[in-house]
Each structure stands twice: as structure tokens, then as C-alpha cells.
């Protein structure tokens, strides 16, 4: 985000200096008929020009406090800072992984709540950085409108999800039917109300700055809400499409750190001086192997491979189905050189294992660029971490900067190469039609199946 500077030797707000008169402006006020817009532009230039300044002009965000538990500090007090950070990161990583396994055990609904909670926290961390940088300018309604827009965008995206995956539940509730039927109009009306509130909150001194912060909020919404929505869409395709990509990113993060910590010598990128080629390459091979094994293990269980569906008869999410061909063992011919090494011509694999190679490759080669992007953002504001939520790790956004990029790739991958027509969704749409429309579809479908020879023609006597 760009920062304020002052033109023409005019000191900041509250300073004693005055700007030089503009061309054609008399000292005695002979040009009182000059347009108000020109005067407002001059004020905007004095107080809101955010361009053409060096990094030294960026105000430093107050440093985050250390939240490492005291008992952990005392236990590691004799170690160097390098090894102290190693142990803190390691202990907290194992703790988070254990909690993640617990949430997986609790089911897909808890995973959805976890994704929403992470989304809100990431949004709060990014918005807080903007507020800390510009809090001295007392922007009216900035934080209130930011959270209002978050609610509006969430309503827009997740209203669509409710309509798609909870159709049977919605049909039983009159109030929900109204919200779903007019969902897009309600979403637009809510956003329009926030837009009008923003326009009404504009203040002369801060026009340009307020528009910068308006853009800040919307870019933050684009990063957090849309990506978390894609994560939940992936989860509905089957928990395996959620777990393998996320765990691949986590594996790459851990193994790249380990390889870099012990073997790192060659810097990888200037944005992150601690990143090394050794860590990057070691993380790549480790992640591909991990993803391949994880795909094999998870493909065995319906709990992970079946699409998540809401069943109205049991009033809960279920993961029961006949696994698709993607999750059924198939024989594949080995290349000649592997046949010589393994002394066999074929190998049994789940087709999803082959897809996992693409997912793991993206997680290890492209995913880290999400982290590099976040590093550049933090360098721009002279901060080490987005927050201090997790000792040794920083904020929640520091842990999920690569996950958001991964979520988009997985969603595009599924829609491009995997997803076909969903019979349950088609049936849900048919059930909400009028009886006459349903009969017309039935007759058309019957004629179509008869012409294809699937149904025997019925002869009228």
C-alpha cells in the first residue's frame, strides 16, 4: 500500500507552512469564482498523493508481541536463537497437525467451519495491517465497512452453495426458499447499501486514501473469500480432494524447511533470503512421494473418496457411495526400464494416484510462489509476520498463503479433467419444477431412451 507525502514544501496536516499559490490565483481572492472541484483537487493533492516516494516513507507497522508460552521459553532458554526457533516451530507444527487430524475425524461439516474460521482470521490480519498503517488518519467507517463487505461477499458465495447442496433441506423451510430464490438480488442489494455507505463516508482530506483502502478491502476479499469458497467446493467433491492438496502443501513447507535448515547453501529468491535451492528441490521430491502414498492410503476408504452430500432423512452430511473408477485399482503397464528393475510388467494403482502427482507437483513448484508473494507484501510494510497468532509461525495468513493458490488450482483441475454431470444435482433441480414441467421432461426422456433401445417401446391396443 502506498503512503502519504506532501508537495511543495507543505508540512503535514497540522504544520505551519502554506502551499504556494497556483498560477492565476491572486492573494486577495480575486478568483473566488474558481470551481470548487479545483480546490478539492488541490486538497487531495496535498493530503492524498500516494505516489512517487521511497521505501523510507512507508510507516512501520508496530511489531507483534511474542506469544511463546513461558514454559516453552524456559525450557529452551539455553539454546541459540536458531535452534530455539527450530523447536518452537516443530512443537507447534505437531500440535496443529494433531488438531487437524481431530477435526478430520469429526467430519466434513467441522472442516467447513474450520475453513470459514481461517477465512475470517486471514481477512482480519490483512485488514489490520491496513488499519495500523493508516489509523492516525482516522478514516471514517473503514473497519466497519470492511467487515460489512465480508458478510455480503460470504452471503453471495455461500448462498449459492446452500442452493446447490442443501436443496432438500431448503424445500422444507419457507423462509430459506425466499432467501435462495432471490439470493442474487439480495446479495446485490446488500453490496449496494455498503457501496452507498462508503460514498457517504468520503471526507475531503482523505478522498484518495479512502479509495485506496476501498481497493485494499476488495482485494483482500478476493484473496480470502473466493479462495475459501473454492476450498469448500473441493471438499464437496470428496474429502480426498481437500486433504491431499492441503497436506501436500504442508508436507512441502515442512520438508523444504528441513532440507534448507540442514543442507541449505544456495539462496533461492531475494524476497525470502532464508529460502534455498536445496530446500526447494528436497521439498519437491518429498512432496511428490508423500502425495503418491497419501493418495494410495486415502483411496481405500469411502469416507474420503465419496462426495459429501446432505441427507434430509438423517439430517446430516453423509459420505456413502459406490466409489468411481478414479478410486478403483487398475493395472498399468510399466515402462521397459522399470520392468527390468522390478521384474514385473504391470503395477496396480488407483487412477487418483496419477492425479496426485500433478497436485503434488503444483504444491511444490508453484505453490511456494504464494509464499513469495506474501513475503513481498510483508517487506513492503516492513513487517516480519501478518500477526503473532502462532508462536514461531506468525499469523494464520503466514501458514495459508500457499494454500489459497493451491485451492484455485485444484478447483480448476477438477472442473477441467475430473468432474462430470452430477445426477443428484440434476434430480434436485427436477424436484423443484412444476408437475407439468416434470411430466414433459419424463416424456422427452422416455422417448429418447426408447429411440436408443434402452427402453422397450410400449404398444397401444
UniProtKB/Swiss-Prot annotation:
What sections of the sequence does the record tag as coiled-coil?
A: none
Alphabetical keyword list: Endoplasmic reticulum, Lipid biosynthesis, Lipid metabolism, Magnesium, Membrane, Methylation, Nucleotidyltransferase, Phospholipid biosynthesis, Phospholipid metabolism, Phosphoprotein, Transferase, Transmembrane, Transmembrane helix
- Compartments (UniProt record): Endoplasmic reticulum membrane
In this chain, where does the modification Omega-N-methylarginine occur? 7
Q: Where are the transmembrane segments?
A: 96-116, 149-169, 183-203, 230-250, 279-299, 357-377
List, alphabetically, the InterPro entries matched. PC_trans (IPR000374), PC_Trfase_euk (IPR016720)
Extent of Basic and acidic residues compositional bias: 22-56
GO CC list? endoplasmic reticulum; endoplasmic reticulum membrane; membrane
Q: In which tissues is it expressed?
A: Brain, retina and testis. Found in cerebellar Purkinje cells, pineal body, inner segment of photoreceptor cells and postmitotic spermatocytes and spermatids.
Leader peptide range in chain numbering? none
Which reactions is this enzyme annotated as catalysing?
A: a 1,2-diacyl-sn-glycero-3-phosphate + CTP + H(+) = a CDP-1,2-diacyl-sn-glycerol + diphosphate; 1-octadecanoyl-2-(5Z,8Z,11Z,14Z-eicosatetraenoyl)-sn-glycero-3-phosphate + CTP + H(+) = 1-octadecanoyl-2-(5Z,8Z,11Z,14Z-eicosatetraenoyl)-sn-glycero-3-cytidine-5'-diphosphate + diphosphate; 1-octadecanoyl-2-(9Z,12Z-octadecadienoyl)-sn-glycero-3-phosphate + CTP + H(+) = 1-octadecanoyl-2-(9Z,12Z-octadecadienoyl)-sn-glycero-3-cytidine-5'-diphosphate + diphosphate; 1-hexadecanoyl-2-(5Z,8Z,11Z,14Z-eicosatetraenoyl)-sn-glycero-3-phosphate + CTP + H(+) = 1-hexadecanoyl-2-(5Z,8Z,11Z,14Z-eicosatetraenoyl)-sn-glycero-3-cytidine-5'-diphosphate + diphosphate
What role is this protein assigned?
Answer: Catalyzes the conversion of phosphatidic acid (PA) to CDP-diacylglycerol (CDP-DAG), an essential intermediate in the synthesis of phosphatidylglycerol, cardiolipin and phosphatidylinositol. Exhibits almost no acyl chain preference for PA, showing no discrimination for the sn-1/sn-2 acyl chain composition of PAs. Plays an important role in regulatinng the growth of lipid droplets which are storage organelles at the center of lipid and energy homeostasis. Positively regulates the differentiation and development of adipocytes.
Describe its assembly.
Answer: Homodimer. Interacts with FOS; this interaction may enhance catalytic activity.
Q: What is the name of the protein in this document? A: Phosphatidate cytidylyltransferase 1
- Provide the species name: Rattus norvegicus
- Annotated gene: Cds1
